[in-house]
Amino acid sequence: MKNALRMLPVLLIGGLAAGEEQAPKPTAAEVAMPSEAELMKIERDAHSGLLLITALVADTPMRMILDTGATHTILHEGSVAKLKKNYFWIDTSHIIFEGNTQQKPKMLAAPLMAGPGISPRHALVVLNLGAVRSMMGEEIDGIIGMDILGSLPFTFNLKQNELYWGTPEGAVLTPLYGTMTRGGRMMVKAKCGSKEVEMLLDTGSAITRLKKGDWEAGVAGEIMAKMGNVNHTTQGKMLEGKPADIEVAEGVKLRNVAPLLEEPGAPVLLGLDALKEAVLIHLPTEGSDYGKFFMMP
């Protein structure tokens, strides 16, 4: 019996700036600064398989999930105490928050370094990520979203475990079917058999999820699935689809995908399990905050 893991730290935010106030400076133990090589490293969590980096928030090392399904970068509220200086709380009284969180978000501004990306004064959403943290093999401090990932080049070759910032030299790139949202997320127009299904490209999800009626291959059986988001975790029996292919780009099929099959209204997600044999590449777009996603045939 398999366990299916699911992270959904998606938050849509409008009207970021609304005034600031100086944050208190909590005391914190000195921590060793990671080397440049460690800051460039992309790894996989031993339990969930999600992608992790060490980022610097206000010059403080933080372990963060790389999540193409998140519009904004999120910091766990318990990790704020690690920050010693050089950050400010943002007045959120006039900010409209939209998304799946049931919490009342806070925000702070701080220098952020994620891989080769540097944002001198980045707005980070502050939430309790206890549910997300409970599903990870190591303690994480937050989530890196498309607000900074959208301006960075990266390659995720899960089959070869080649995860790095940049793109392979001389590679032939095929654009993913679909469109980018206003928050920089990729909505893939995937071909599941004879049906075209819009799916969120979500590296913050370890498992692919579809509506039951959209999976022509049918149901393989029931599995015990543990899923969670920024609010809570749930566990129970869910339907698993029979393995089949999903076409996501011209001449590129994701092989033997076995998604969770759910009722209408549930998120429709293209997760890391579907990318296990694929090479996903993101390139920035000149003059835009967000780039484009490609596959290698």
Where are these predicted regions, by residue range?
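Sec-dependent signal peptide recognition
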Residues: 2-10
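Hydrophobic h-region of N-terminal signal peptides that target proteins for export
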Residues: 10-18
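Pepsin/retropepsin-fold aspartyl endopeptidases
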Residues: 19-297
